[in-house]
Amino acid sequence: MKKTKLILFGIILAAFTSTATYAAEKFKVITTFTIIADMAKNVAGDAAEVSSITKPDAEIHEYQPTPGDIKRAQGAQLILSNGMHLETWFKRFYENMKNVPEVTVTTGIVPMGITEGPYNGKPNPHAWMSPDNGLIYVDNIRDALVKYDPENADTYMHNAEVYKQKITATIEPLREQVEKVPVEQRWLVSSEGAFSYLARDLGLKELYLWPINSDQEGTPQQVRKVVEQVRKYHIPAVFSESTVSDKPARQVARETGSHYGGVLYVDSLSSENGPVPTYIDLLKVTTGTVVKGLLDGMSNK
């Protein structure tokens, strides 16, 4: 009798443990880089587990996935990518992900084109740098989660609306910051041409050393072209990005007497303890750095 009770107890315990484990398992989402991951986490809340293939502060254009990346991605039930030729490495990576649906989160965005270099005519992939486009990213992420994890559809739809309100609330303050700078001085000079969408939205004229990070970076011809333009228009500041060398931008500043305004964030978020741990932080910090750099450059002349 005792033995029977013990066996019965063991069966019940095993069933309870199995049920608890199953209940604890969350829908698993993998994203190609940290910015999409942050957006997806805001939409998913506690209903899904979201992680990024690339790490914080990574250069994402020509990232080389590791065996560890592939291992971590195993078991994913959904993959979210940017598209627009951003993740040049992703096609080969995806070959290892059998039967996992992949959703491109830039669907519906009207791309700005790259107008020079070997990528001339291709879409500029940095569409998230427009807060208005950011809202489209969120809608696409929401729709993907609802489609592939319908049990949590209400959660995803509610969280997406809350998050979109937060993004929308940042837009006007960003524009107000830029208005502190005289119109003729509103330039965004950077290493990579990654800020076209932000410059357009905020009324900034754009100038860059190279169009995209997978192109040649900091050649003498690129530096000379920007030096000439900075001198011609008396541009007060130049900037570089967090994932590339600041030497070419500093060289432009040195040769023109322009102010080096600091580091801008675009391709990756920082770690949690860094300056831009979230997408909204990235928009705020990058815009704030541009405005401060321009104003400091004007005061130094």
Positions of PLM-derived features:
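Bacterial N-terminal signal peptides
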Residues: 8-18
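Bacterial N-terminal signal peptides that target proteins for export
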Residues: 1-8
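Extracytoplasmic metal-acquisition and chelation regions
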Residues: 23-301
